[in-house]
Amino acid sequence: MKKAVIGLGFGDEGKGITTDYLCSIVKNPLVVRFSGGHQAGHTVCNVETRHKFSNFGSGTLRGVPTYWSENCTVDPVGLLKEFRALEDKGIHPIIYINANCPITTPYDKRANRVSDSNKKHGTVGVGFGSTIQREEDHYSLTFQDLFHQFVLATKLDMIEQYYEFPILSHSYYEFIHACSQIIKLGLFIRLVHEMPHFDNYIYEGSQGLMLDPKIGFFPHVTRSNIFIEGMDKYYFITRAYCTRHGNGAMPNEDIPYNITVNPNETNVTHEYQGKFRRTMLDVSLLKYAIEKTNVKG
């Protein structure tokens, strides 16, 4: 069975904890990350551990493996750091990464952070949008390329020419080191060409439908499609109030509200994203988002 966890708003609705719960009630699940990539931040807590997932699926604390589809970006530096952080917590995560996943480089991260357009429209600052744009411009670097030294070096040179600026040598060698370590971790970080077979598939979405380029308010949208068709069941997620990180339209901001800040809130004001905003929930906007998906029932 295929189940999808989709945010109804502007992101930060609770997709991680929902994915974690669904993994607890089905047999032999696989979490599938199908959109976005390493820019996600999905927090899951259990009795012993709290973790924010960016490079692994949110079923990882339960020992559920992750499949990273070819539509998702991979940040080798972030992936290795999160793998080590999970190991330090006694967790040995397994992730299947599609060979065609786009790779985020230090060049993409710098481009994301210095772009005036990104600052205006909104960015997490981890290179996601720049990676997608570079791929569309045919300067491609994929997960499979990391396993071929000459291909990797050649494509990195081409990417530097594409951006027309250098990066700090520390960032470059940190990236190269992460790539080499990931190759050595093949037992846990696995290169695949198709999704492995499991009994149940939990499709963990990223961000929210109101950031989908076909649904949200351009230009304050993301570079990936939030919705996925063909699921057996959909779980549309919202908080009891509306949230948005950074710039862009948001309902009910002119209405006074008294929303207590959760002391365990993961989302805070961010150097690149900006302020984490809260307003009263607009149920009609939730209805609009669902209508745009054409999901019935």
Named regions from a protein language model:
Residues 1-297:
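Non-transmembrane, aqueous-exposed alpha-helical and coiled segments at domain scale
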